[in-house]
Amino acid sequence: MAAQRLAALHAAAPSAFSSTSSASHGRPAARSSTTALLPVALPRASATLRAAPSRLLPQEAKAAGSGRSVMCMASASASAASAAVASGAAELKAAREDIRELLKTTHCHPILVRLGWHDSGTYDKNIKEWPQRGGANGSLRFDVELKHGANAGLVNALKLVQPIKDKYPNISYADLFQLASATAIEEAGGPKIPMTYGRIDVTGPEQCPPEGKLPDAGPSAPADHLRKVFYRMGLDDKEIVVLSGAHTLGRSRPERSGWGKPETKYTKNGPGAPGGQSWTAEWLKFDNSYFKEIKEKRDQDLLVLPTDAALFEDPTFKVYAEKYAEDQEAFFKDYAGAHAKLSNLGAKFNPPEGFTLDG
């Protein structure tokens, strides 16, 4: 009886594999035979897959584990960097609101614009090393640089923004100076500046640039002087003219620069400390009136420096100056790009590409 059952099983076994045998000879397999294969083939394949990891050599297993660790570390590092940028952007946005409030109460737009400009305007494109190349690196906070002749009065700007720096200690001075400058332009009615942040500060006064890097108001050859200074920074004739348009804000004080009247009908009274001579009648409003006033030269109470007059005397400069006197929209557009470029000169960023505030 047992022999009969064994014979029956032996006879049935070939039918389970008959489809494979037939296919190997070019004959189509019966549908019922294909179905019969599935319960046999799939469990075997699954068992093979489950057993595969156990066949890794020790070195391979170690390498696989190391690779996963590196990936996890990279992911954690990227997450930390992203969180740091988000935190930095949040602090800068909060600081920007404080700057806006400061501007409302002190009307210090001109001196904050100057603060950002003079920190970045020391850049030398011919020097590659940071911070020797100068530029927007926060060095203007040190006394040795504040005492440069071109920076007369900027200690007052530092005093204005220092409480904001104390409130947000993670913001670099370099970022704070440029944030204050761009915000002052915007709050005075000027264009929105497409700013980048993440600038790194220098750490000591020994890293300050030498004196003499900034423009002089009354050189013997004004156009040549402007080109020498701005070309060193990597800026061109168009950018020289459009950036000069920021003189639509502010006044020149003779006790600081040696230029201008002690006071005029436009500066005797009004917001802020009285005195000085302004380039425009509404010297807290950012517009293209600077170019109009220089071109017309009709108001003796308004200031025109030799470097201002050069914009309409030099034939190349004049093309741009005439354009901006007629077209404020063009002035705003070109100014926004030039100001953003100036604010980045010489800067070293963390992260290297910097980051924006997105509104």
UniProtKB/Swiss-Prot annotation:
Required cofactor names: heme b
This one is known as Probable L-ascorbate peroxidase 7, chloroplastic
Positions with biased composition (Basic and acidic residues): 252-266
Q: Where is this site: Transition state stabilizer?
A: R114
Renumbered residue ranges of the record's region Disordered = 251-277
Q: Which domain of life is it from?
A: Eukaryota
Which species does this protein come from? Answer: Oryza sativa subsp. japonica (Rice)
Which PROSITE patterns did the record assign? PEROXIDASE_1, PEROXIDASE_4
* Induction (free text): Induced by salt stress. Down-regulated by hydrogen peroxide in leaves.
Top-rank EC class of the record's enzyme: oxidoreductase
Top-level taxonomy: Eukaryota, Viridiplantae, Streptophyta, Embryophyta, Tracheophyta
InterPro entries per the record? Ccp1-like (IPR044831), Haem_peroxidase (IPR002016), Haem_peroxidase_sf (IPR010255), Peroxidase_I (IPR002207), Peroxidases_heam-ligand_BS (IPR019793)
